[in-house]
Amino acid sequence: MKYKVVYRIIIVIAFALSGCFNLDSEKIKSDERFYHSAFMDWSMKKKSLAKNYTAIIMADPQPWRLNSGDPNGISNREPWLKINEQVASVIKAQKAAFHIVNGDLTEFGQQRNYDDYKNVYKKFEAPVYEGLGNHDYANNVGHCTIPEAYDFYQDACALSAVLRMLSEIRQYRRQLSYFNADVTESSILLPDENIHEIKGSLSYSWDYGDVHYVQLHNYPSYTVRLKGQSTKVHINKSLDWLKKDLAAADARGKVTIINFHDARAASIDGESFFIRKKNAKDLSVFKSIITAHNVKAIFVGHTHYQSYCRAKNDKVFGNIPVYTAGALFNGDYYLVEVKGKTIRVKAYNGAIGRPLLIKDLGIIGEGTQFFASCSQL
């Protein structure tokens, strides 16, 4: 039998070399890409079984924002690239299992800004999992077109951010363990067009070792309606989805880290979009959800400076600690060391070209210092 198999292989090779078989090189390349992709997906799921690992949580790369100049001006591009390429090299050298970016991937949702972020921060050997912030979609709703793509709909930039995120979610679905996402897609057939309809908060979650990670994007109660030439988007609150997702994670015996963008304490300057008195009902629901489940910590961005807060019974967060990541364009990030269900957080800065430890914030939940309030409500 063995000799028959070998003989058949020799015959196939001979026919191929003689030209009797037309081996399509493009098809071979396509198959190679497919099998490579499938292997990578399997490999990433296997790695997620690890109990001990490090992760890096960061926010606000926001090209081309700096602490001076026009964040939308081309004159800021080269200085932004110089600073962020240095920060990225520092982060890459720390060899984390994965990275999380909690929003403001762009300054105004535009593709050229996203491309610079991608070329700087998505070339690590380990994956990067993204969240959207107010600068990616909320800030440009109704007044940002993409003329270079002949897209003159006023929601064009916000839509492009949503569609990029949807593409990421499709990829994550193949690669992440116990992946869950709050999004549905459908086609509406009309007499003269086909509408792609997207509904949900775009929130997603996954397990890595004993930890369940959740990404809620801008903030948990954010809603918006977007319209393009052949696309309609209904971004809904993530609260109902979050409640079910956390219950499922609890049932699997996981502890949870929640990520989103804006948890800035209440203020009068209009830059705190989630924690506002007018959102009191949603804030109360959010608190009831997170305090009823095994949530270890919340990681956010938005403010552009690193901070930590934990209260005994905050009106929004209960006694769950909140870690604000600072801004990547300033070099800020958190290194998260995971050993089973024990999680240690260290604040770093990479702006000087090496990892500078700003503060070891210790093991989550073991601190004895409490603030009077984190939400300032």
PLM segments and residue spans:
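Hydrophobic h-region of N-terminal signal peptides that target proteins for export
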Residues: I13-G19
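A short C-terminal boundary segment appended to hydrolase-like catalytic domains
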Residues: K27-E32, H36-A38, L49, E337-L377
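Extended active-site neighborhood of metal-dependent phosphoesterases/phosphodiesterases
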Residues: F34-M40, S68, Q111-W241, V285, ...
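N-terminal active-site segment of His-dependent metallophosphoesterases
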Residues: F21-N113
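Sec-dependent signal peptide recognition
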Residues: K4-V12
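Loop/turn elements at helix/coil->beta-strand transitions in domains of secreted/extracellular proteins
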Residues: K51-T54, Q94-H99, F124-Y129, Y208-Y213, ...
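Active-site neighborhood of phospho(di)ester-bond hydrolases with catalytic His/Asp-centered motifs
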Residues: I57-A59, H99-D104, V128-N134, I257-H261, ...
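Active-site-proximal segments of metal-dependent phosphoesterases and phosphodiesterases across multiple
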Residues: S68-R77, P220-D240, A249-A297, G318
